[in-house]
């Protein structure tokens, strides 16, 4: 790939000590790598320092918690700024009169999360709880992008850390856009499972949220919205960019910029993992300790597949997966208590006409959120592209990968219609090489992409 599409311009790197005095360390920075991950709550970064006679560690001194500000201009000449805090120092070594070490950085909230404890009891929807925790406990001024949920919940945090509380809510939260069959069993809903006999009912719907930080702020949204391109009820967004795996020779820079420099598949279709986690089918045993009522449900993903958002054009589970879904590969036992937060004298269970404001909705999220989470990263691919600081985790991009067939056949269909298509950015690193063997600073981006199904949206998938 042409170096012209990788160039960036360092502006200033400043470390502010505990008294707020700023030190310009721009000339000592060898490499700055910024990280985001949808499975991690806070952004992080690594900054390689090549310290020649300054001894910043001893003279500032660096004690931890110092504010680091990195200012630069990206490939497009746009101003970019990162504000982080020193978490720790690693890989420190001395060679002649040079010190080499790496500053591990994180967001301010990433450090203060360990001291912020949630003690207040909440009675609200999950997104309202998360919003209050971030604003009034973690004291962040960053924006929260939250999706509206269906059920209210009563939560007593008992002094949990902010992220620990949010994490406990993620898999209990059901999007308001989710559709499922509420209420008691109805005729014709018996499961094909051999477990539990003819009284086993089917569990339906989809559930589960993710919480993470990206360059825009904090995200608390359902996995289905993250996988939605906006054409379904979950109201997601379409791909922000399209990248191609193709030769760069002779191409103008504006086209080279959207080339995939290299890519590698990182595990595809791990059937054993999926079966061990009960992705395709789970047998759920529920016992309400207040009413002494026992029920069994079977979650069959093949029956609820079309209630989810999908990144590919595949419209059903693969044939063998549907066969496996007929018999649960996991059995779970769950205690319910509809009356935990109910003080009335009548029945609390809303399925039996009760009016509890905060019933136990475990039937509607336990198996569903597990299935949604592990289906989400069925296909993984890692790509390297020219630096694009506009990209963030939670975005979707479209990639076009070559059709690995004979050259004559490739002329008719140049791209792989199953492996290509829309992917979710699950993790990324923006890598700024301040010191480079080639001379000028270079910026490249590594992306970890995931998706749940195969196929390009514009074409029918071959999966049957």
Model-found features: residue ranges?
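Assembly/oligomerization scaffold segments
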Residues: 1-114
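An acidic/polar, Gly/Ser/Thr-rich interaction patch typically located in mid-to-C-terminal regions
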Residues: 33-61, 244-464
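Envelope-exposed proteins and targeting segments
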Residues: 43, 66, 80-82, 99-101, ...
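Glycine-rich, acidic and aromatic/proline-enriched surface loops and short helix-turn segments
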Residues: 99, 106-110, 123-143
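Short beta-strand-centered interaction patches in the first periplasmic/extracellular domains
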Residues: 100-109, 144-287, 296-299
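Soluble non-cytosolic domains of exported or imported proteins
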Residues: 120-128, 156-164, 388
């Amino acid at each position: 790939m042409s170096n012209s599409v990788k160039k960036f311009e360092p502006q200033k790197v400043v470390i502010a000590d505990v008294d707020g005095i700023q030190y310009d360390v721009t000339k000592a920075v060898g490499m700055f790598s910024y990280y985001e991950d949808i499975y991690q709550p806070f952004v992080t970064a690594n900054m390689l320092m090549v310290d020649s006679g300054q001894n910043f560690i001893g003279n500032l001194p660096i004690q931890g918690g110092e504010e680091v500000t990195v200012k630069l201009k990206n490939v497009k000449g746009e101003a970019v700024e990162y504000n982080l805090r020193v978490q720790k120092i690693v890989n420190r070594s001395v060679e002649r009169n040079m010190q080499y070490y790496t500053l591990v950085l994180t967001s301010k909230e990433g450090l203060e999360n360990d001291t912020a404890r949630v003690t207040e009891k909440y009675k609200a929807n999950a997104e309202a709880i998360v919003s209050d925790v971030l604003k009034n406990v973690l004291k962040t001024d960053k924006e929260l992008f939250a999706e509206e949920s269906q059920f209210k919940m009563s939560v007593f945090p008992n002094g949990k850390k902010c992220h620990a509380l949010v994490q406990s809510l993620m898999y209990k939260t059901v999007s308001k856009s989710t559709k499922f069959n509420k209420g008691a069993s109805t005729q014709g809903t018996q499961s094909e499972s051999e477990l539990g006999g003819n009284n086993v009912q089917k569990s339906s719907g989809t559930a589960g949220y993710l919480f993470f930080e990206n360059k825009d702020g904090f995200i608390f949204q359902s996995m289905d919205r993250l996988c939605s391109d906006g054409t379904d009820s979950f109201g997601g967004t379409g791909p922000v960019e399209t990248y191609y795996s193709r030769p760069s020779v002779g191409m103008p820079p504006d086209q080279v910029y959207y080339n995939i420099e290299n890519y590698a598949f990182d595990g595809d279709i791990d059937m054993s993992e999926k079966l061990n986690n009960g992705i395709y089918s789970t047998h759920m045993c529920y016992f309400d300790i207040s009413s002494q009522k026992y029920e069994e449900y079977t979650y069959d993903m093949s029956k609820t597949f079309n209630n989810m958002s999908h990144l590919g054009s595949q419209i059903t589970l693969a044939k063998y997966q549907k066969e496996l879904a007929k018999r649960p590969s996991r059995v779970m036992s769950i205690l319910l208590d509809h009356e935990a937060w109910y003080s009335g004298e009548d029945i609390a269970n809303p399925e039996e006409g009760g009016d509890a404001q905060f019933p136990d909705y475990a039937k509607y999220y336990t198996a569903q959120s597990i299935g949604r989470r592990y289906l989400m990263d069925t296909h993984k691919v890692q790509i390297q592209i020219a630096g694009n600081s506009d990209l963030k985790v939670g975005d979707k991009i479209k990639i076009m990968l070559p059709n690995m067939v004979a050259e004559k056949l490739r002329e008719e269909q140049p791209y792989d219609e199953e492996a290509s298509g829309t992917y979710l950015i699950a993790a990324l690193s923006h890598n700024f090489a301040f010191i480079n063997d080639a001379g000028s600073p270079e910026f490249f981006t590594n992306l970890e992409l995931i998706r749940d199904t195969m196929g390009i949206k514009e074409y029918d998938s071959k999966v049957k």
